[in-house]
Amino acid sequence: MSAIFEILDKDAGGRIGKLRTPHGVVETPTVMPVINPNIQLISPKEMRSFGAEILITNSYIIYRKEELRTVALEKGLHELLGFDGPIMTDSGSFQLSVYGSVEVTNEEILGFQEKIGSDIIVPLDIPTPPDVHFRRAEEELATTAERLEAARKFIQSKQLLAGPVQGSTYPELREKAASHLKDLNFEVYPLGAVVPLMESYRYAELVDVIAASKKGLSPTSPVHLFGAGHPMMFALAVALGCDLFDSAAYALYAKDGRYITSNGTYHLEKLNYLPCSCPVCSRYTAEELRKAKNKEELLGRHNLYATFAEIRLIKQSIKDGKLLELVEQRCRAHPKLLDGLKRLYTHSAWLEQFDPATKGTYFYCGPESASRPEVLRFGKRLERFSIEGSAIIRTSPVKGEKDYDRILTFKAPFGTFPAEMEEVYPFNAEVPKFPDYEALSTSLSNTIKLMDLNPGAEFTFICEKEFQHPLIEEIGKKAKLVYREAWKKE
């Protein structure tokens, strides 16, 4: 594990950790509010009251403005912003992505960040946007790699150095870049050029980008999802292993009259009620907030409260082993997020290696739950069950079951397991009485696999009338199939 990053708790790919910086320890996952040195809707010194432990600002903006540059060089970045905690600085890559060029070299901006006392320094990488030609992505990635290698040699202080992972929307390039950077031993790994994906709600592709990058990195490396600032997607990103986010959304949305919640965004002009109990929403009605002279500031404050409330809920969900339940709730807030959830579970085999072997009770939240890592793990371990003689499979106790050599329980979405394990994780799962098609598909497939692994056993399967699924016919070829109603009459 990295000397500067300690993992305390885990669930799925998410983790609670401690990131050590020159200006203190930060608990992750967390959000870094973006501070514009020229325009401060809410002062940096107030950020701690919302829950902020670390800020991020743009060193290129400071570098370009003589007044700011002079103060930063003479008194330091922390004095300039009036914040005594950790501060990360971006290098100007955002301006490069927007305007196509910046008036500074990689070495110049690295040296400037080092001199002003940034806690996390970011090199001037090339933010390759989505959907470009593969050759362009590959060429720009090579340029970024050269700059990052130079940065690693250039920065020798105790300040942390970030190694941004680029590669556009090509998972193979993302994983290749991450693997290369891992060998250079950066302290923090931002995932760059993902804002266009989030702005266009391309969450399925975002999931692939994050997963590919994470697969190339050490599992103990802290990961920063650059430009991710809306709380509705934090849980999804955390479940993939992201530890740091940065948010200018609190201010940008406030300027546009938008009200952030963990389930999406409202336009203040259309709100009759404020669905929040933060200090702002507890004091004002929707109408009063609209008429307030400092409406933008108040809205920005609410947006920050909502942002950090979601971070706290995510941390508690990790503690409780309920992160994926939260992810499934959040991803039903928007169809595109649901696409992201479905894509997340295509990576379940990878996630399963990080998911704790035992944790809080599994809750079935919908069809996607049938693809969770816990279910996949069960399917991989069916060979551990050795069954001989007569065996009865049922969802709940039936008359005459003790006449059989083995009593087995069927529970979707898992499948069939020894009845004596019903109260053991994950079989103590809370599931619907009537399983959906996806849950039946997985559980019946696992049951067929169990039967195939134990060809010497004689199975009797007590089927519920609600089990309408093509695989029931296959079960009937391998076991005596009896519907519960018919069993009662025997």
Swiss-Prot record:
GO terms for cellular component: cytoplasm. Its cofactor is Zn(2+). Substrate binds at D125, A193. Belongs to the archaeosine tRNA-ribosyltransferase family. Its EC number is 2.4.2.48. The lineage of its organism: Archaea, Methanobacteriati, Methanobacteriota, Stenosarchaea group, Methanomicrobia. InterPro entries: ArchSynthase1/Queuine_TRR, TGT-like_sf, TgtA, tRNA_ribo_trans-like. This is tRNA-guanine(15) transglycosylase. SUPFAM superfamilies: Pre-PUA domain, tRNA-guanine transglycosylase. Exchanges the guanine residue with 7-cyano-7-deazaguanine (preQ0) at position 15 in the dihydrouridine loop (D-loop) of archaeal tRNAs. The gene is tgtA. One of its GO terms (molecular function) is pentosyltransferase activity. Gene3D superfamilies: Queuine tRNA-ribosyltransferase-like. Pathway: tRNA modification; archaeosine-tRNA biosynthesis. The active site is at D90. It comes from Methanosarcina mazei (strain ATCC BAA-159 / DSM 3647 / Goe1 / Go1 / JCM 11833 / OCM 88). Zn(2+) binds at C276, C278, C281. One of its GO terms (biological process) is tRNA wobble guanine modification.
